[in-house]
Amino acid sequence: MSEKIVQLNEEVIKGQLKELVRGSVEETLNELLEAEAEKLTQAARYERNEQRQGYRSGHYNRNLTTTSGDVTLKVPKLKGISFETAIIERYRRRESSVEEALIEMYLAGVSVRRVEDITEALWGSKVSPATISELNKKAYVPIEDWRNRPLQGGRYPYVYVDGIYLCRNWGGEFENVAILVAIAVNEDGYREVLGAAEGMKEDKASWISFFQWLRGRGLDGVKLVVGDKCLGMLEAVGEVFPEAKYQRCTVHFYHNVFSVTPRSKVKLVAKMLKAIHAQESKKSAREKARAVVAQLRSMKLKEAARKVEDGIEETLTYCDFPSEHWTRIRTNNVIERLNREIRRRTRVVGSFPDGNSALMLVCARLRHVAGTQWGNKKYMNMKHLEAALEDASIAG
């Protein structure tokens, strides 16, 4: 008797298994959302009890891309209480990291075969080589939208600016391109990434264009701009934000003095400079600065003395603001930490094919950082500034 041979269609089976897994993932995630809602409201659906916080108001659908495929989340709508699900938040962080990784792969010259393997691991399907470049273009779109978003944090009293130099391969020749970066502390005391733009070089025209772009997106209420003494920046601040004052970063100022100081005397000079900015008033800081200049001259450090004498006043602007804010507004450290992270990420690329590629990778990183605890943790108590403004001690 002949035996029946059963032929299995491997592709059909794989498709059915994938759909089974996708369905299971979708069901599990929706159960987790319901559990989150129950925990927040302290009650199950339709349950009435004295501990209940808020009420159900149906659901809304939200698509989520997972390694098992696209799933539809039924997100509970609540009345009387806000519902920020941890699942969506984790997705946002993952989405930002995927965009950044995709751009990095493209810029770093990863082989097409390797990119195919990675995209299959991320999205569950292998893309063709012709599609890879399109994926990178698509990754640029949300980053560019974020970069040009309206600034809605109200007023931004403190603004920090800096420039990052990255290497660009322009027609076979390597040259540096400046990416101008700005962050701020808003009127509620939270840090916010304002934006980044290609500046070609740090000059007056680039800074004016950058500041006007920020102002056009909603940057307002600027009282102080903190940054290094870059070429043309001080003049640009005066033109675009005439009511704002300028604070030269004390750390950059120190390094400028160290550049003309013998290595054997740097530690001593650093101690002398820090003593100036440890004073409790602008008057005493000026007096201390005069003493430091005299001491430097007695040490035969005439060039260092000249730099201190010429530049010290620009480093004392912070004294016009609440003393509670001094340590955080006299340096550019808050933006320098971000820049170090950006440099760590861009170092693996080496040289960029164009300025826009460099800008997109920088913005991808800034966008990621902005969505973390960095931007959600209060940085300053702005009531001190409000009180000072009411006393008209900073007006003008």
Regions found by a protein language model. Give the residues of each.
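Short, positively charged, Gly/Tyr-enriched micro-motifs
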Residues: M1-I5, E11-K14, V21-T28, T65-G154, ...
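N-terminal juxtadomain amphipathic helix
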Residues: A43-K74
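Conserved beta-strand -> loop -> alpha-helix junction used to position metal-binding or nucleic-acid-contacting
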Residues: L224-L231, A236-M272
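RNase H-like nuclease fold core
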Residues: K74-K79, I87-R92, S125-K126, T131-V226, ...
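Metal-dependent DNA phosphodiester-chemistry modules and their immediately adjacent helices/loops
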Residues: E84, V257-A291
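Subset of Sec-pathway N-terminal targeting signals
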Residues: S2-V12, L20-N30, E34-Y55
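Acidic/histidine-rich catalytic cores and adjacent linkers
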Residues: S2-K4, A35-E38, Q42-A43, L107, ...
